[in-house]
Regions:
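Gly/Pro-rich interdomain helix-loop hinge
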Residues: 61-64, 68-151
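Carboxylate- and glycine-rich phosphate/diphosphate-binding segment that chelates Mg2+/Mn2+
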Residues: 1-46
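Intrinsically disordered or highly flexible coil/loop and linker segments, enriched in small
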Residues: 20, 42-48, 87, 116, ...
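Alpha-helix N-cap/helix-start motif at coil-to-helix transitions, marked by capping-box chemistry
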Residues: 1-9, 48, 68, 98-101, ...
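Short coil/turn segments at secondary-structure boundaries
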Residues: 1-3, 27, 120, 143-146, ...
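Short alpha-helical scaffolding segments that buttress acidic/His motifs in well-ordered protein cores
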Residues: 4-7, 32-40, 54, 74-78, ...
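Short, amphipathic C-terminal "tail helix"
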Residues: 149-185
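Glycine-rich phosphate/pyrophosphate-binding beta-alpha loops
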Residues: 37-70, 165-171
């Protein structure tokens, strides 16, 4: 967890300047390279989740760049994962329910978010992520990237099935149903 948490903190601290100033801020770019390396080491040992599975399909079907695809759906997936009682839970049988809300709140606190409850910290963390996305030009919705709505809807069932079967999905804190993946998209 330490590598992932430190990487998140470094992204918040450095991505806006690295994006806005590019080569004129080599320190921010260096810190982003380090954050990327740390994040890679973290997920190589812990795997990813349904956000990544869904992003794979947005890239494959609609040619969205992988980072953009991950970013545009991130907060919706976080809200899905943070639900108190999931529809289905079975991948990690040692847990009655996932503890995603508490874990997101822990990460939010580490990134500087405050609140009186985990729910408040989580909502502040979501707001901080949305602010970061806006600063670096991530659009609000998939549709905002110019994807034809009819084509998107025509491919949605295939995307959902493939995202459900993606190797990353099994590591998600909540094991999604295909209809839930569709609702997130």
């Amino acid at each position: 967890d330490g590598l992932a948490m430190k990487a998140v903190k470094m992204v918040f601290e450095n991505l806006p300047s690295a994006y806005e100033n590019g080569a004129n801020d080599p320190k921010a770019r260096e810190e982003m390279a380090n954050a990327s390396c740390m994040a890679g080491m973290a997920f190589a040992n812990a795997f990813l989740g349904v956000n990544h599975s869904m992003a794979h399909k947005l890239g494959a079907f609609h040619h969205l760049p992988h980072g953009v695809a991950n970013a545009v759906i991130l907060t919706e997936v976080m809200r899905y994962n943070a639900a108190e009682v999931p529809t289905k839970m079975g991948t990690f049988s040692q847990y009655q329910y996932p503890h995603a809300l508490a874990r997101y709140a822990e990460l939010g606190r580490f990134a500087g978010c405050t609140g009186n409850t985990d729910e408040e910290v989580f909502e502040n963390f979501i707001a901080k992520l949305e602010d970061l996305k806006e600063k670096i030009g991530i659009k609000k919705t998939i549709k905002d990237y110019g994807i034809d709505e009819k084509y998107f809807l025509d491919t949605l069932d295939d995307m959902c099935e493939q995202a459900f079967n993606d190797q990353c999905t099994g590591a998600n804190p909540r094991y999604p149903l295909m209809k839930e993946i569709k609702e997130i998209y």
